[in-house]
From Swiss-Prot:
Cellular localization per UniProt: Cytoplasm
Family per similarity comment: Belongs to the TRAFAC class OBG-HflX-like GTPase superfamily. OBG GTPase family.
Name of the featured protein: GTPase Obg
GO biological process: ribosome biogenesis
Amino acid sequence: MKFIDEALIRVEAGDGGNGCVSFRREKYIPKGGPDGGDGGDGGDVYLIADENLNTLIDYRFEKRYAAGRGENGRSAGCTGHRGNDITLRVPVGTRAIDNDTQEVIGDLTKHGMKMLVAKGGYHGLGNTRFKSSVNRAPRQKTNGTPGEKRDLLLELMLLADVGMLGLPNAGKSTFIRAVSAAKPKVADYPFTTLVPSLGVARVGADRSFVVADIPGLIEGAADGAGLGIRFLKHLERCRVLIHLVDIMPIDESDPAQNISVIESELYQYSEKLSEKPTWLVFNKIDTIGEEEAQARAQEIAEQIGWEGDYYLISAATGQNVQNLTRDIMDFIEANPREVAEENTEADEVKFKWDDYHQQAMQNPIEEDWDDFDDDWSEEDEEGVEFVYTRS
């Protein structure tokens, strides 16, 4: 299935139903009074996270999603039915953004999390609400309010503990294959990886972490060169970044310069992302001798002013890979993910209906019936006719 990590859709909540102007007309009950019911509330639009989905391809072609409109009120004090809600299933890790205001509505980071993205309109009031001691036959009502309508940008951001950075052909996909059961495509040409992929690295029987591989970056990626930087968003939720460097590039480029290019592109994309913990890992040491690799790595680290530790591995042969994964696992366990306490069930906000009704009644709509009277006529289905006789 094709990997789609962005989708722009239109969500429309249902409008509230209008109130009804009606009067009770029944045999033996003269002047029965108002009995117009309220309308129904409009339906809402929700997003829910589903761990069984891994792409937004379902929203690539179908762009508009509308909830049901609330029914209008009816006579006999009957309230209209509420409009039907709709729930859209999206992958875990999806972020919802209002495309007009760029407001982040929320992130769905756990399976089953549910988020309201468009609120339905409130119901209108029937003429029964306007009955009073001085207004026995009210002909006022209110209409329902419109539901929310939004252009919603959905962004899928992979949830991983470790993110891989590097130029094309640095060996990122080979590393994923070495530490996990994932089998991303590996070849001897640039941009073999075209879409992000995930792998689960197991360290022992009950210890594991998730690693994300994204397409390689090149100089000018921030300006759209290569595959651009659109996939860097998948690293925003990682706890540590692994910067994989080819210690002896086949194109004879300078590894120190290559490191600077990646750091520059990362900073241009997001200053916050560039401040994440980053480990420097030199790959393909099997292509040169171990002593030469040590000396070359030391020289590169001095050129870029690297003050932290660095690793030398060969993802192709597995040399030193186990030590690296063990240290990554220890770091992840020592630095648990900082997640704000989120209620999986959204706090229910109780709408102040009394205040809404009071405000709505200040600006009612008055029905003007040219031939309105409360007396019975032959056109009425049923009722009581008053016959006055002179005694």
